[in-house]
Amino acid sequence: MNPERSERIEIPVLPLRDVVVYPHMVIPLFVGREKSIRCLEAAMDHDKKIMLVAQKEASTDEPGVNDLFTVGTVASILQMLKLPDGTVKVLVEGLQRARISALSDNGEHFSAKAEYLESPTIDEREQEVLVRTAISQFEGYIKLNKKIPPEVLTSLNSIDDPARLADTIAAHMPLKLADKQSVLEMSDVNERLEYLMAMMESEIDLLQVEKRIRNRVKKQMEKSQREYYLNEQMKAIQKELGEMDDAPDENEALKRKIDAAKMPKEAKEKAEAELQKLKMMSPMSAEATVVRGYIDWMVQVPWNARSKVKKDLRQAQEILDTDHYGLERVKDRILEYLAVQSRVNKIKGPILCLVGPPGVGKTSLGQSIAKATGRKYVRMALGGVRDEAEIRGHRRTYIGSMPGKLIQKMAKVGVKNPLFLLDEIDKMSSDMRGDPASALLEVLDPEQNVAFSDHYLEVDYDLSDVMFVATSNSMNIPAPLLDRMEVIRLSGYTEDEKLNIAKRHLLPKQIERNALKKGELTVDDSAIIGIIRYYTREAGVRGLEREISKLCRKAVKQLLLDKSLKHIEINGDNLHDYLGVQRFDYGRADNENRVGQVTGLAWTEVGGDLLTIETACVPGKGKLTYTGSLGEVMQESIQAALTVVRARAEKLGINPDFYEKRDIHVHVPEGATPKDGPSAGIAMCTALVSCLTGNPVRADVAMTGEITLRGQVLPIGGLKEKLLAAHRGGIKTVLIPFENKRDLEEIPDNVIADLDIHPVKRIEEVLTLALQNEPSGMQVVTAK
């Protein structure tokens, strides 16, 4: 292309807002500013030539000399028309680029001295490649941008001038004002084409992204419209078939419930998927009933609802003290939990296991803990549970399947953080249907129960906010399960504790339950003590409550039969008239010291008890017989005790060959009751020595402890229960292993005061204290 000659001109200047006019471009302009209209009139008076220059800022109403770009387009006015509103419509055609060398404002309009821009010499082969590429790229751009009519491409192919081609492309591109001005200022055609190609590439990328987004939105709209249409069709069909009335749509109600349940993302997706399935089913089908039941359970389970937990320690302590007498260790543990909770907002609920004999208040204590902490109370009885599905639920493939009892109870209580009482956790068993104790491992593990998996729900459920309290009569709980719980032992009550419990709780409760009015019945302390001593022998207070209930019933009967009677007083003297013959003897069962008879102390699931051990020696051939339903451990204790006696036969004055000439029979009465355990060794040994030497055993002495072959006394468990049993039985002197001396701190003071407790290390000390006559020939070292 030959360079154009630079020509200087003087010409009126029309400022344009947001518009850049290129050469060969025909465009209508609406002019409203007075100064601009005068500029058009001046151009019409001369040769109809005018220079169109863009303003730097479109918002400037009255631009100055410095507010215009220096490069514009010289244009020819093709047509000018004045409109009724005072504005002027003018049709112009761009002719050539020009640069302003001097711009002036004569007060009427802008005027400029300008010179046409020249095009530099270029490589025509390179330009041809650029033209082809630009046309191809613009074709791709037009396909994506539906706003540009396809006819533009046809007219573009008919343009032979590369400069005009570039300007036409620029005119149809949605460029910013600065970019349009940059194109106008480029006199080099090749540079202009390259710049436009880069701009087209950027626009094509944006249009492709826009197209993808538009397609996605369109698909979603089509899907939702299709689903709406099909649902309406289905409703119409069902209505025609009589399967659906004009009642509110059940599916919509379920959808609202799902939204209101505030489920976690996984659970909500599962529930919504099941709801979609339900919509496709006939409402009367069996499968629809199953799905509907599943969704009902999903919305009933508390996913987010919590009850407000109390943080007032003093109030909690008052509630626990009012509801329960004693049980200080348990109360302290609950108060410790509340104290930590008051400082830490998110704390995992403790998992406590209350172990103790029946009737000591384990279950009622769970209710009191719930009351003290402000949690809702829910109880699950585990006695006799042997199916794992009771805990984890049944899979939905089974007919009549339901969630496990755990989830059912959570749905019933309606909050995520109740106090959950697992009652009688030691009474579970396993069979071919699984082991529920193993299923509870996940429930009672604070690290795992954040994602408890119920077979029916099929989604994880968070149990970490639940405060679990388990109850048990014994430690006969699987070791892994026991390891996950904090065990708190509840021993039996002392006589004083039972008296206070009866006066504070049991008697008022039974008076109210039997509809006795105030002042109609008085039960003296001596009567309550009489019931405790002569009519009950238990670790708890259930039997005591039954006897008090019996007193109340008899009192009501008396009052109704004898209208003149207004008040009944029961004391120790007339207790026999209401409860009949005394069932137990308080004090020693036997007042005489007897040969071969020893009082041992035993621990049972219902508390401690006195255990009588009898031994008899008869002429024979050294046969050893033991009766009384003794377990293997107790039988081994007898064997060990016999060896200890044989090793000390000479010192004890026993014929060394007694085991060859005499038969020995060891018997523990109440043969129907199985007995076992490792704490009767010293009692067995003492009974054997007494029998073989003829030295009577003191009747006021009871003992507990295992024995080794060297005569050492080993420690035992359940000391508190055993000492309480000795106290109840009227025993005065108790022999315990020396290593159990530290356990005496847990024994009530009144029991310690009433008993003469001797910690012993060796069998020699036991024999010295237990036998009526001190054994001869034995060196005794008293334990300190």
Curated annotation (Swiss-Prot):
It is found in: Cytoplasm. It catalyses: Hydrolysis of proteins in presence of ATP. Residues 11-204 form the Lon N-terminal domain. GO terms for biological process: cellular response to heat; protein quality control for misfolded or incompletely synthesized proteins; proteolysis; response to heat; response to X-ray. The keyword Protease applies. Pfam families: AAA, Lon_C, Lon_lid, LON_substr_bdg. ATP binds at residues 356-363. Its main location: cytoplasm. Its EC number is 3.4.21.53. The active site is at residues 679, 722. Contains an allosteric site (distinct from its active site), whose occupancy by an unfolded polypeptide leads to enzyme activation. GO terms for cellular component: cytoplasm; cytosol. Residues 592-773 form the Lon proteolytic domain. GO terms for molecular function: ATP binding; ATP hydrolysis activity; ATP-dependent peptidase activity; DNA binding; peptidase activity; sequence-specific DNA binding; serine-type endopeptidase activity. SMART domains: AAA, LON. Induction: By accumulation of abnormal proteins, such as at high temperatures. Under stress conditions. Disruption phenotype: When both lon and ycgE are disrupted levels of OmpF decrease, leading to lower drug susceptibility, with a greater effect at 26 degrees than at 37 degrees Celsius. The mechanism is not yet understood. Decreased persister cell formation upon antibiotic challenge due probably due to increased levels of MazF toxin. Keywords: ATP-binding, Cytoplasm, Hydrolase, Nucleotide-binding, Protease, Serine protease, Stress response. Changing residue 676 to N: Loss of proteolytic activity. Belongs to the peptidase S16 family. Both its proteolytic and protein-activated ATPase activities are stimulated by DNA, especially single-stranded DNA. Both high- and low-affinity ATPase sites are present in the homooligomer. Optimal peptidase activity requires ATP binding and hydrolysis at both sites, but ATP hydrolysis is not stoichiometrically linked to peptide hydrolysis. ATP-dependent serine protease that mediates the selective degradation of mutant and abnormal proteins as well as certain short-lived regulatory proteins, including some antitoxins. Required for cellular homeostasis and for survival from DNA damage and developmental changes induced by stress. Degrades polypeptides processively to yield small peptide fragments that are 5 to 10 amino acids long. Binds to DNA in a double-stranded, site-specific manner. Homohexamer. Organized in a ring with a central cavity. ATP binding and hydrolysis do not affect the oligomeric state of the enzyme. This is Lon protease. It comes from Escherichia coli (strain K12). The lineage of its organism: Bacteria, Pseudomonadati, Pseudomonadota, Gammaproteobacteria, Enterobacterales.
